[in-house]
């Protein structure tokens, strides 16, 4: 075929093709059989999480130094694509694990990376991403969730909306205003744990599809977290949020 060598430029590497075959086989054998029930019953696809975790495919983006595969963006796309081929709800497990944890990868301290990326890589907990709010969707910089410094702690108050896998994930990257006079440059990012006192969740949203992946509000009522759970420097949270979307919205 004329010009076929040009198409070779876009051909995935052999390792990516092998990954696709592996994920497809796993998805067809261990995820597809439950897909209809997951959607009809609007229940979280625990079978998919178990299968992906057992195969180390639940968070392939985590760097090797923290126990992950250190996979590139294309590998992440392939995993998401092949899982979505049989169950869209299940595909949001690897997708949102990356979305939620990438701020830590990009901007977190070394201690923060060790504390949260290791458990993520081992499958001990999932990550979610808390940016949008009831009155701050497309205008994310207009968020109202606040984080106030109190000695060696930050105290968070507010609500986040449309949070994927909320209530299932153990860890949440939360964007909150730390200096309301600076708008986007007054927003900081934090890691909040589901077990932190004052964290609660709204009822699952009723959706037309992808019903197995819960979408819920997340409430923060005087949630006190250690000061070292801030991601990066104070005031850099919005920049980190946008960098995260640059990486993850394409995958």
Regions found by a protein language model. Give the residues of each.
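Hydrophobic, small-residue-rich alpha-helical packing segments that form membrane-like cores
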Residues: 138-139, 154
